[in-house]
Amino acid sequence: MTVQQPKRRPLSRYLKDFKHSQTHCAHCHKLLDRITLVRRGKIVNKIAISQLDMLLDDAAWQREQKEWVALCRFCGDLHCKKQSDFFDIIGFKQYLFEQTEMSHGTVREYVVRLRRLGNYLSEQNISHDLLQDGFLDESLAPWLPETSTNNYRIALRKYQQYKAHQQIAPRQKSPFTASSDIY
């Protein structure tokens, strides 16, 4: 009588099946059409996945699967790529999702604008102290980029609402940070 060995498959095959089984972003719960696979806070691209030829049986895959998460492209960029620390982008995004009735597309527009502005202000070595003074769109007006100034002002006013909401309804420290170690 022979003992049957458990069936082993390459990790890349398990990941392909995993990728196709995911329907919603693990972070914002948006229905997925394009997917970003993340392992321990780092994006793993399709070329790297295709090279994962380690053989696993089903039990090993069950353990390994806990290390992987499927995100929409937007959340993948926000949570896994370096961000400027000028604004609390992750907290702002959560606020827009949880406290407003905005569509995912509108949230994305506000977040992208604020992220670009934060990167721009950091590159210009603008002091973070300006965030403490009154209305953000007025405080930062002299340093706003010349293109799309109104769009940046609108995003700053929405961010001001987020900051006011934080002061009115103080919550425990948010588990969402601007780094990639959220997993």
Curated annotation (Swiss-Prot):
Gene Ontology terms for molecular function: DNA binding
InterPro entries: Flagellar_regulator_FliZ (IPR022523), Integrase_SAM-like_N (IPR004107)
GO BP: any one term: DNA integration
Described purpose of this protein according to its UniProt entry: May regulate sigma factor activity.
Protein name, UniProt field: Protein FliZ
Protein source organism: Salmonella typhimurium (strain LT2 / SGSC1412 / ATCC 700720)
